[in-house]
């Protein structure tokens, strides 16, 4: 099923029983977080708060609170079907050279489909139906959530931040949280390696002292939102990928105050600039780790214009100790990652990011081991192949007979197949999430790999244990008599 815009997605979710309207007054200050958190932990529906306290604008929460809704947002009916999305991305990331003319013709439709999904620029759009500029810009008109008691203030969480550096044609689109500090000012928390921060750095080098144009789209269609958090190859734009998911080209419209292009169907768009040198202390905020993060300096985004649809809907979320919405997104996107990894490492059988590991900090890999030291090669591959795993601190590698998604199985393998000195790999001074306060230096820490595979000659001189397995004939006989046993 495909969706034109966020409102179409809301309508379809409601028809499926996957969205509930909340008609009573609920405060965006803390109350929405508690309601969304309880609902998410119960596997409940997306929530449309129709009467946010002190506001007339509805708030959409818990939109991607189950893996199924993530799959639906990607145009699929099940989480399992996301493997096909991953296979497409794996092919586009590293296409196999055709072995002949016949095979070349077979791959041609795939490339044609991608080319046909290039975004379409339109002259007018619903996201610019209403325009507020100058003194009329007031973020207090938007019911921005304050999520936790110790938060520094209201926090915009689902904004798609659009930037463009001076050295490339393509725009960057990323999701960076924004602390509201005034009627027209928010703190843009982007880490130094992220696309928006790199664009800003390059801009400051080429145009020192000049304001840097930025736009933030709130409430885009689900394919565009999910395109911004999916491991899209550098050769494919997020908008083209969203078009593939949606089955139609992404429509973009030029901002009123800059040349940046934003999703035409977005509910709200914030337009403005970042003045070089204008920074402010950001935080603390409760984060996906389950802790409040440190305070640090980040650029301030000055909003010069707010455009929106008529009767806009504000899309929001919260982050907290897993499971939260980012953790659920991780569970679903896990299925997209697997084919991409398998394309590079065919020996990988399964790959699992447990949600309790804060979405990406711990990975379990099962593999078909082929030679001594093979598990260590896979560890290094996980850390280096996709930038999404740059911050993965722990990688556990096991054999294919272990279920990566069953902790009892994984712990059994670790405690029976590992020697701590021989089978751990420690790497120091590697990139680590800025929010990881356990690292000795902000943004720099260590990683550890656990080789929980059966050891081959060359890795051990001892006779290796043989797993206990019941005789199949005995199992069949017991199956036949089971119901007579009264158990």
Curated annotation (Swiss-Prot):
Reactions performed catalytically: a 4-hydroxy-3-(all-trans-polyprenyl)benzoate + H(+) = a 2-(all-trans-polyprenyl)phenol + CO2
Cofactor binding annotation: Binds 1 prenylated FMN per subunit.
Biological process according to GO: ubiquinone biosynthetic process
Chain residues that bind Mn(2+): 172, 238
Annotated localization: Cell membrane
Signal peptide feature range: none
Assigned EC number: 4.1.1.98
Stored PANTHER family: 3-OCTAPRENYL-4-HYDROXYBENZOATE CARBOXY-LYASE-RELATED (PTHR30108), FERULIC ACID DECARBOXYLASE 1 (PTHR30108:SF17)
Family, similarity comment: Belongs to the UbiD family.
Quaternary structure and partners: Homohexamer.
Role according to the record: Catalyzes the decarboxylation of 3-octaprenyl-4-hydroxy benzoate to 2-octaprenylphenol, an intermediate step in ubiquinone biosynthesis.
This protein's name: 3-octaprenyl-4-hydroxybenzoate carboxy-lyase
Source organism (scientific name): Thioalkalivibrio sulfidiphilus (strain HL-EbGR7)
Lineage of the organism: Bacteria, Pseudomonadati, Pseudomonadota, Gammaproteobacteria, Chromatiales
